[in-house]
Amino acid sequence: MVNLSGQSIFPKGLSILVPIAVAGMALMSIVGMQLYAPSGLKGSGMNSNPTEKISATAAQQAQQQETARLKLLKLLPALGYNNLLADWTFLSFLQYFGDDPAREKTNYELLDDYFEVIVTHDPRWVEMYNFLSTSVSFYQARPDLTVQLIERGLQSLSPAKNSKAWLVWRTKGIDELLLLGDSQASAKSHEMAAQWAEHTPDQDFSPRLREFAETLKQNPDHLLIRIQTWLMVYSTTQDKLVRKRAIQELLELGVKIKTQDNGELTFIIPPETSKKQNKKK
């Protein structure tokens, strides 16, 4: 039998504080977990039924409550639940993002706040960065914030930690090229994507990424590259807003668009586009 009557290691009078401290930490953990949960602490104030109409006043109040909750989430310690808290914050983001009636009243100004919390607690979650780009760059119209958050996340990423990490550099490079108009930054990002793709199951992408980067460095205003990249954006998403933006940009770049009998779109790149680019080489 173990003897539990040994002398306490705490000075007399302080030992009583130990269970209080433990209880305090437990309480903080519970409160923190409730705050991170999709419903928040006594609910986040978001519309629980996104199909219902909501008044402008109610939408603003819900937005203010969610703003306050997200500020707390940025300050509270994770207490070892980083991945779980990032997951719950992502679920809250989905609820906020999908609440169309409320977003019509308040717009999407909290999107970067959700992803700041997520990137802080789980920066190695590679798949999350696509949602970051689509939502913050297109819906919130802040690709600059997308790039800033991606740069923070990349500090914790490497191909050794996740073989798909090169995709994050690729996402950054696309936003820099198409939405920020920074061809040189995009070229650097694609060079890094190529470097990180080496010695991974996706190593076949590395030469193409390097070629893409080299083309941008030699011709920052390469029209065909922009057209092909917008076509890639259109074909890899089902999001209506992103597709609408891609179509708009392609039309401005001179691409002809025809609607087939089945409703699918056909994109026709003017022959002179390729000829012009070949002359510049």
For every predicted segment, state its role.
Residues V119, L154-K161, A194-P201, Y234-S235, ...:
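A conserved position within tetratricopeptide repeats
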Residues L111, T146, A185-A187, R226, ...:
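Solenoid-repeat scaffolds in large eukaryotic assemblies
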Residues Y81-D99, D122-Y139, N162-L179, M192, ...:
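Amphipathic alpha-helical repeat scaffolds of TPR domains
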Residues M1-A78, N82, T266-K281:
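Extreme N-terminal leader/anchor segments
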Residues R69-A78, Y96, E104-D122, L145-S158:
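Amphipathic alpha-helices of TPR/Sel1-like and other helical repeat/solenoid scaffolds
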Residues D99-N107, S137-L145, L178-S186:
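Short coil/turn connectors between adjacent alpha-helices in alpha-solenoid helical repeat scaffolds
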Residues L209-K281:
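Terminal, low-structured helical/coil segments at or just beyond the last alpha-helical repeat
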Residues Y108, F115, I150, S189-H190, ...:
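Inward-facing hydrophobic residues that define packing positions of alpha-helical scaffold repeats
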